[in-house]
Each structure stands twice: as C-alpha cells, then as structure tokens.
C-alpha cells in the first residue's frame, strides 16, 4: 500500500498563520459531531526504529528489545454511546482492525541485514473498547492486551490524534490562539513522573478531503464533496518530575525493584480537523524519545543499565471509500 504525500513544513505553517490572523476572532468548535451507531474507517501508517544498548552481568527479561516496525492498515471504529458531559461529551467506542500489513525486525547486536517478519492480521480479529473522557484522556480500555504489539501501537497513534479535540478549550479556538496542556505519559515506563507538556496552535483553514483506497492500495481524494479543515500545529516535550536518583514506578516497587535514570522526548503533530463534521481528516506525527535507566533489585544487586533511542513517524487518514465497501 503506497502513499505519496507532500511533506508539511512547520516554517510554512507559522508563516501562513500570520496571514490568517486577520480573518477575525471567531471561535470554532472542533469537537466531532458523533452519534451512537456511527462508523468510521481510518488508514493508519506507523514506522518506528528503536535502538537499545544494554550493560548487565545477569540475564534479565526487563530490558526492551531493539526493533524496527513498519505497519499500515485499516481501523474500523464504531461509536457505541455518546454521553453529554457539560460542553464536551464522553464517547464510548469500539475499534477493530480490518487489515494490518506489518513488518517487525527484532534487531540483535551485529545484525547487518533486516530480518523482517511480515504478517497480515486476520480481519476477523479481536476488538478493543475504550472511552474518551471530556478532558481528552482515554480510559476503560478493554482488549488492548490481546492485540499484537504493532496493532497496539497503531491504535495508540490513532486514538491520540482522534482525541486531540477534547483537550482544546471548551468554547472553541480562533486563528493564532495557543492552548497549553500537561498530560501524564500513559504508556508504562521504568521511570516515574513522566508528563507531556503540549502546546497547540490554530494555524489556518485549508481545503481538505477524506481519502479513498483502491483495490491496488492506491490512495486518492474521495469522490465526496470537498471540505475545509482547521489546521492545528502541536508540539510536545516529555518532562520528568521524578528524581534521576530514584525514579521507581509503583509497579516496580511491588516487584522489589528500584530504578534511576532520565527520559526526554519531543513530538511534532500536524492535525487537519473538518470544520463541518469535527472529524480528524488527516494527522501526521514525528516523534523522538531517549531514555537512560538503571534497574536493580531493591538491595542494589543485579543491576542492569540500558539506554533506548527511539524515533517514529505516523500518519492517519479518514477513509470514506475502500475495496471492502465493494462487492
């Protein structure tokens, strides 16, 4: 499945933001207008490259694996319930991968060639249920642990982009406005007190359109009417509130383990949200994270030191026509 898109330049977005500031001070609500029973399909493409260096005199299962992942597939989302909660609604939904073509390469020291293990996910696979709360947090997640790691990461990329509108001001946004938010890192890590400091800016409006997918996997604009999207630029920085000398999470303490170390990261996200429906039509993310951590038993024995350097790129696209729609 090949996707050819022109890269978006942050500098260009900020330059055009200055032009659109004169369009007025109107506030626009970017929340999606969802109804129970509504279904959506998103194409997700996720690529990551994680390098791990480990120093240890003992054999340990806790160090993460170095790996490259290249996955793309279709996610079907069904809205199960919409509960009004003030200015923002709480959404209960279910997701299922219709297709997921993925490649995973578990890198080992000295590897010079890519050892890709490719797989196609059964379209009759398991589902995942979840709730998006009015503050944008994703809760009551069921079924995630039963998915393949590539499915988990692809779904996490999608839900993070889809839930962005819930983190924005309840009274809407206007051109040039910035919105800051701090959220706890929701993916488990051996370092406690990790938080993302996010800043979103409403850059401009731009013509946009959902996508359609051919039976050959070619991507093009859908045959539906054109739309207009609000373009949001979001930057995020990973901050550590715990001490580097004692960064032990609670679940590590329960297993009589102690950790120390540091973590940092940056993300840049560009999101296109339909002004008509409030749906995310397209979103891209570039992410980079680094972690240097020491894990040992509570008494200081059996120390394992490793650092992780990870980079990823993801893209999600709203798809209104697919080969699965055709007989």
For the regions a protein language model found, what residue spans apply to each?
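Generic secretory/membrane-interface signal
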Residues: 2-4, 19, 193, 262
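Bacterial N-terminal signal peptides that target proteins for export
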Residues: 2-12
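Residue-level marker of intrinsically disordered, low-complexity segments enriched
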Residues: 1, 17, 314-317
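Hydrophobic h-region of N-terminal signal peptides that target proteins for export
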Residues: 14-23
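Signature of exported/secreted
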Residues: 24-327
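Short intrinsically disordered, low-complexity coil segments enriched in acidic
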Residues: 1-2, 229
